[in-house]
Design a protein with these regions (language model features):
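Polar/charged heptad-repeat coiled-coil helices used as signal-transmission/dimerization stalks
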Residues: 3-152
Length: 153
């Protein structure tokens, strides 16, 4: 009789083990607990399932934000300082990281400019003593100073 009433514990244990393997990155998939009753074990299983699914959604949201962050860094590496991270992670630390990185990009854009490739091209022209061209839509400090320098020379 006791084993009959405690048998749902095995299903709960299996479900929790699957969940812990998932959140510890041992597996990419997670299963929910099969709920066979509406007693205390069934209610506990349902509550655990809700949290498993919520955690899975949150981790997927965080993964998407990390992917977009990596893509944003690639865009910035190519010279475009207007790129920003727009995906919203769920993890508070990732939200803070996103905000700090976007603030850093705001500062770089304000102090340098929007297009590092255009700035580099103008500097190459200046090295060849060609001061005719200007940076279009200059707004960053380096861009504005570069245009002013070209005007003076």
């Amino acid at each position: 009789i006791v084993s009959k009433y405690l048998s749902p514990l095995a299903a709960i244990q299996t479900g929790l083990t699957s969940f812990f393997d998932f959140i510890n990155h041992k597996t990419k998939n997670v299963s929910t607990i099969e709920v066979k009753s509406n007693d205390e074990f069934g209610q506990i299983s349902s509550a655990i399932n809700e949290n498993i699914l919520a955690t899975k959604r949150g981790l997927e949201q965080d993964n998407q934000a990390v992917k977009e962050s990596v893509q944003t860094v690639s865009v910035v590496e190519s010279g475009n300082l207007t790129a920003r991270i727009t995906a919203n992670p769920r993890n508070p630390q990732l939200i803070e990281l996103k905000n700090v990185l976007n603030k850093l990009l705001d500062v770089l854009q304000a102090r340098v400019g929007s297009d590092m490739n255009a700035i580099h091209k103008i500097f190459e022209e200046y090295k060849s003593l060609d001061f005719r061209n200007k940076l279009e839509n200059a707004s960053g400090s380096v861009e504005l100073t570069t245009n002013a320098l070209g005007d003076e020379i």
